[in-house]
Amino acid sequence: MDKKLYETYVRILNKELVTAMGCTEPIAIAYAGSLARKTLGVIPNKILIEVSGNIIKNVKSVIVPHTHGNKGIETAACIGITGGDAEAELEVISHVTEEDIVAMTELMNSASIKVQPLESPYSLDIRLTVSNNEHEAMVHIAGTHTHIVEMTKDNETIVCREALKQTIDEDYLTLTMHDIYTFAKEVEIDDVKELLDQMIECNTAIAQEGMNGDYGANIGKVIAIRKDLPSLLKAYAAAGSDARMNGCELPVVINSGSGNQGLTVSVPLIVYTEREHLDKEKLYRALVISNLTAIHLKTEIGRLSAFCGAVSAGAACGAGLAYLKDASEEVMNHTIVNALAITSGIICDGAKASCAAKIAVSVEAGILGYDMYMNGQQFYGGDGIISKGIENTIHNIGVLGSQGMASTDQEIIKIMCE
């Protein structure tokens, strides 16, 4: 494999597979809150939170960790202000104390807090302004969860960066299924081992916690009533989401900015490897395939849209499972196409308990997509949104998610705000 392309793929994995505690959208608000408080220097008595529609959608119904079960935008901002560590970025509230939670409650009860929708070209856009009687500070994050566009204190600029361009990073344009498969077969394990070990450790732990605890609708435990292996692959992935969406304080290694997608591309592969007693190196290579495939699928769709991210992650999971079963590149590609043909209509209506069920359905689509092709069955080019050739189908999904479902996204947000 070309050395430059090899290094690009390693760089993409290092950029995308990062650790986060809690659903990433409320955590981004908490991060903005921690930065704003640090800039102001004191706890504010007035807070203005301006957010894009997709942030409203993804924060409204999800429990924020370390808040005693509280949900929503105000909660995320206030725990960031009272207990956040700005240096920790997506783990900003990982070291919150009981005193911080008490202070959060007091702040929510005493401060003037206003949430406003923000008209923005970015699906991810947060502008948080805090003040006391003497000073004011503002933090603006846009494009990605930790990309600071602007910071000010008393209208004096502290940070001013160019907003991320609404174009795809050139690194990501190099992704193709052929090169992903080649990279996974050839990658030096030491180049990805530390990254993937962290994913295995973190994502296994929260999946197990979801199976042990009582979180949300307990989708994982419901599915696990059936003891067969395909059910367990779905169950453990769903259990991780059960826990994550409902306030579990364990971290997750994310994919494409999403913890749920990180769980979907990893946990079924980890469980399958353990149950089938496969070697660790094979798991590493399968995780390379599933992670890069999910990133490839999401590149044109975008970080936040009306297209459920579990769908693309479930198809990517199917590709990883195919690799674990010694499948060829051809089988892997048909697995992905079949899976996308099954589940691509699932909408994203925000982060919440039902995400776990959508993960289970999407993993099932990945499994079925593989089983179909291994039994001589497939969906063909011309069947709905499927085109001849894997890359053409991936492009169709990208157009559907980014352009075709834009108005759907607005209607979902409108319904959720009623």
Task: Set out the residue ranges of the language-model regions.
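Acidic-glycine-rich active-site phosphate/pyrophosphate-binding loop
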Residues: M1-V10, G41-I56, D228-G247, D279-L297, ...
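Glycine/charged-rich beta-loop-alpha catalytic/anionic-binding loops adjacent to active sites
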Residues: Y9-V18, I55-I63, A243-I254, A294-L304, ...
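Signature of multi-pass transmembrane helix bundles
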Residues: M108-G247, E411-E418
